[in-house]
C-alpha cells in the first residue's frame, strides 16, 4: 500500500464529512420510501422526490470533488496506478447513478406516471447500488493509502 502525503488530515476530514452527508441523504430517501403511501400518494411522492433531490445534489457534489483535477481519483491514479481500473469503474458508476437519479426524478415529477410500489422498487435498487458504490470507494481509499474513511456514521 502506498502512502501519499497529499492525502492529508484536512482532506480526510472533508471526505468523511461528505460521506456522512451522503449517508444521511440515503437514510432520508429510505425513510421517505418507508412512509405510508395509501390515501396520500401525492404527499408521499413529494416527500420521496424531495429526499431524492437532496441525495442527487449530495451525490453530484461527491462526483465533482472526487473527479476534480486534484481530487482523490486523480491522486489515486498518480500514486497507485495499479488501482486505475477501480477508479475507472467508480467514474462509470458516477455517470450511471446520476442518470438513474435523473430518470427517477423525472418519473416522480409526472403525476400518475408510476405507482408507489414501482417507485419503491426502483429507488430501493438505486439505494443498493449507491451503498455498493460507497463500499468500493472506501475499499479504494484503503487500498491506495491504508486509510479507513469510515461508513459515515
Give the label of every model feature segment:
Residues 1-153:
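Small-residue-biased structural context
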